[in-house]
Swiss-Prot record:
Main location group: mitochondrion
The name this protein goes by in its record: Mitochondrial division protein 1
Membrane topology recorded in Swiss-Prot or TrEMBL: Peripheral membrane protein
Biased composition (Basic residues): 140-149
Coiled coil segments of this chain: 211-254
InterPro entries noted in UniProt: G-protein_beta_WD-40_rep (IPR020472), WD40/YVTN_repeat-like_dom_sf (IPR015943), WD40_repeat_CS (IPR019775), WD40_repeat_dom_sf (IPR036322), WD40_rpt (IPR001680), WD_LIS1/nudF_dynein_reg (IPR050349)
Compartments (UniProt record): Mitochondrion outer membrane
Gene3D superfamilies tied to this protein: 6.10.280.220, YVTN repeat-like/Quinoprotein amine dehydrogenase
Residue ranges, compositional bias (Acidic residues): 1-21, 403-416
Keywords linked to the UniProt accession: Coiled coil, Membrane, Mitochondrion, Mitochondrion outer membrane, Repeat, WD repeat
Keyword tRNA processing found: no
């Protein structure tokens, strides 16, 4: 049973109560101090070092001194009849007391830190040296061999710690050996993965090669089927025309029979001689058929899957220098002309010659093929039109050898590397008509739709109507240059006689291109003139080249020109200024561009290619392979054409090379 003293230890006399309950007696304070000291010793004793328990006792003694102050007594024990033990338990838990005791470091403990005059490293530096992998520098160099070494030198070796240091070194050696072994295992695993990837890549290359062969076979079959379809369409067209003629003849015969009956009744209407002069329907010639424009229904995509600069085929086309060539589409129809006065038509898909075009009396200097319609301009001052769809050509078999066909071999392959003569008469039905109004050789031509323009050494440019087959306009270049000089008063449009790179054999009109009513022509004075065919006047003069212009081509924004001054210039058609320019080591003899590349023949055994997307120059042609294999260099490239990354180049020795670009 609790004594009266235990019931209220804060009173000096249990039977009496002080008038002011907030004032504590000395006896009560001593009892409270003992309880707080006992509680603190009980809670904090197990988690601290016994040697430091005196700190808490001295702390409680200091608390007792402060608690004796009257003001502090009033503020702390203002609540009536609340024991100190209940007050402490309601404010601080065991976990909170332990945390405060561990986290708070009093000043007297900090003052007792021993100082080592012989050690110049701080505690933090020692931590960094012991655990270098936790620092920023250690993280950057974690894979180095020295990552496990200490950054601080160990103290002097004594007999007591010598054994411990040796054990640490052995453990470190074992750890490093294990790590080295693991690195070797990982390296072997990485090598195995690389070998597996190489095997997969080789398998993928093999699969790609097989699929490319399948694609080539599909395109070959597609071309043959398309050729058969065009033949059937031509037969349907002919049958329909014959049916229409028969129907019109039948309709005309009925009224003629009636007229003959009436004439028998009226013998005096006309004499017999008059009737004999009336042409009959059978003798009336039918209207001439227009050239049938045949467009391909499919486009080849095989060349798009080859690496740029890959050689597709080489053709021994001619025995002399190639002067002009053009093709309509990738793996389509190629027409080539040379100094040997021959013009040949080639099937690029099979690599065989379809036939030769005969009619010109001199070599062809310019030509263009579009939708099976071919225009050729020759030194004989004539322009001839041809319909290549009328050629007698069977793409299924060989016309040259009578043996069994080998489907896997390249058709019409010549083992002696000599041009093979095509069958006679295969192109006999191709000529359409001849345009002969020029007085000198035709050096440039271009047609679009029903309009054809041709430039000649007679210093004129003529516009032709392909429907009527006649010349509709003649443009005098010298007269236009004189008119421009007079009207401008600056001499910018005048004929320039002192071009620095003027060549004696340069063509007066080097290149032309027409689109609707717009005409661009490049001449021997280095000028590029833009004409308006509706008025026959020069709309703008582009001055920049110092040599004869040999090639030009324009789209809706830019015009690209090549010249004997060894440069290619890109002009902005909106402002008439130079947008870009490239310089080469030799004169530019031929140039063409597609959506991505500008290709040019610049007096070398390779074709100069400029990639407009990547803005880089590179070479493509047989000269690269010959240089790598230390062989004799091939002939100089004279002509080059490109469409959709499919490039054809013609050389001085008559060989035609076909490349992906």
């Amino acid at each position: 049973m609790a004594s009266p003293e235990d019931e209220n230890p804060f009173q000096d006399d249990p039977g009496q109560e002080d008038e002011d309950g907030s004032i504590l007696s000395p006896r009560g304070l001593e009892a409270f101090s003992r309880k707080v000291t006992t509680t603190a010793s009980h809670l904090m004793g197990p988690v601290v070092d016994p040697s430091s328990s005196g700190h808490y006792q001295s702390a409680m003694t200091e608390v007792q001194k402060h608690l004796r102050r009257p003001n502090l007594q009033r503020s702390m024990f203002s609540m009536a009849r609340t024991t100190p033990s209940d007050l402490v338990r309601s404010k601080l838990s065991t976990r909170e007391i332990q945390h405060r005791a561990l986290a708070h470091v009093p000043d007297d403990m900090l003052a007792n830190i021993p100082e080592d005059d012989n050690n110049s490293y701080s505690l933090f530096q020692g931590f960094q040296a012991s655990f270098p992998e936790l620092t920023d520098e250690g993280k950057k160099h974690r894979r180095r061999v020295s990552r496990g070494r200490k950054l601080l030198d160990e103290g002097p070796t004594t007999p007591e710690n010598g054994t411990t240091g040796l054990q640490k070194l052995r453990k470190e050696r074992a750890s490093m050996s294990h790590e080295l072994e693991m690195l070797g295992i990982r390296k072997n695993m990485a090598s195995s993965e690389i070998r597996e990837i190489d095997i997969k890549i080789a398998n993928l290359h093999g699969m790609r090669r097989i699929i490319l062969e399948r694609l080539a076979a599909l395109e070959q079959e597609e071309t043959l089927l398309e050729h058969d379809l065009m033949e059937v369409e031509a037969r349907v067209e002919d049958a329909q025309m014959l049916a229409d003629e028969a129907e019109s003849t039948a309709q005309q015969s009925s009224p003629r029979d009636t007229d003959d009956a009436d004439a028998e009744d009226n013998d005096g209407f006309m004499s017999q001689s008059i009737y004999e002069k009336i042409p009959s329907a059978a003798s009336t010639p039918s209207k001439s058929r227009k050239p049938r424009i045949v467009r391909r229904k499919s486009m080849a995509v095989l060349h798009e899957h080859f690496e740029p600069g890959t050689s597709i085929r080489e053709l021994r086309a001619h025995q002399d220098c190639i002067t002009a060539m053009d093709f309509d589409a990738p793996f389509g129809t190629l027409v080539s002309a040379a100094m040997d006065d021959s013009v040949k038509v080639w099937d690029l898909n099979a690599g065989r010659c379809i036939g030769s075009l005969e009619g010109h009396t001199a070599s062809v200097r310019a030509l263009q093929v579009e939708d099976n319609i071919l225009a050729t301009g020759s030194r004989d001052a004539t322009v001839r039109l041809w319909d290549l769809s009328k050629a007698h050509y069977d793409p299924h078999g060989s016309h040259y050898n009578g043996g069994d066909d080998d489907d896997d071999a390249m058709a019409f392959e010549n083992p002696d590397d000599q041009p093979v003569d095509p069958p006679a008469g295969s192109m006999a039905d191709c000529p359409l008509f001849t345009l002969s109004s020029h007085m000198d050789e035709v050096t440039a031509l271009h047609f679009k739709g029903d309009t054809l323009v041709s430039g000649s050494s007679d210093k004129t440019i003529r516009q032709w109507d392909l429907v009527k087959g006649r010349c509709v306009q003649t443009l005098d270049v010298m007269w236009a240059a004189a008119q421009a000089s007079v009207s401008l008063g600056t001499g910018d449009g005048a004929w320039r006689q002192t071009a620095r790179s003027q060549a004696e054999d340069a063509d007066f009109v080097g290149a032309v291109q027409v689109f609707d009513a717009a005409l661009a022509c490049g001449t021997a004075d280095g000028m590029v003139r833009l004409w308006d065919l509706r008025s026959g006047q020069v709309h703008r003069n582009l001055v920049g080249h110092t040599g004869p212009v040999t090639a030009l081509q324009f789209d809706n924004m830019h015009l690209v020109t090549g010249s004997h001054d060894r440069s290619i210039r890109i002009w902005d058609l909106r402002t008439g200024s130079i947008f870009d320019a490239f310089a080469y080591d030799h004169p530019v003899t031929s140039m063409m561009f597609d959506a991505r590349r500008i290709v040019s023949a610049a007096g070398e055994d390779v074709v100069k290619v400029y990639d407009k997307v990547e803005s880089r120059q590179w070479d493509c042609g047989a000269g690269i392979k010959a240089a790598e294999e230390m062989k004799n260099p091939p002939a100089i490239v004279e002509r080059v054409r490109i469409r959709d990354g499919y490039m054809v180049e013609g050389r001085r020795d008559g060989i035609v090379g076909i490349w992906t670009c």
